[in-house]
Amino acid sequence: MPRTVVSTASTAWNGDLISGSGSTTLETSQLGTMDLSWKARSEDAEQGTTSPEELIGAAHSACYSMQFSNMLAENDTPPTSMNTSAKVSFNAGEGGITGIALTVTAQVPGIEDADFQRLAEEAKQSCPVSKALAGVEITLEASLG
């Protein structure tokens, strides 16, 4: 029986939304603390400052890569390499997160493009982070490289 694993991150925020700032800490992995600001969300990204949307993109690209690589391996065509990006679109008005564009390029010896495309789409649908983001349109561009 699979066990439930809990991962924890925490955020400290000071001030109001527009002029305030904060930091998010990756508690479980203890990999670090990242600065946050409204400007990083609603305007041009500030160097050294992240946003919830960038963190969602990181989670989604990592989860998708793991899911897709597992599905390829189960197909007896494990990837030798894979690069995935997730571009999260955010409308600072009432739209919120309006879409996520996944792009993956992989080296997969012995696979036909049709099978690669089918498994890429199945991985998008079955990735746990994709499921958590089901209310957002997620597009996929997959290519053998």
Locations of the language-model features?
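Extended beta-strand/beta-hairpin segments
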Residues: 1-58, 65-145
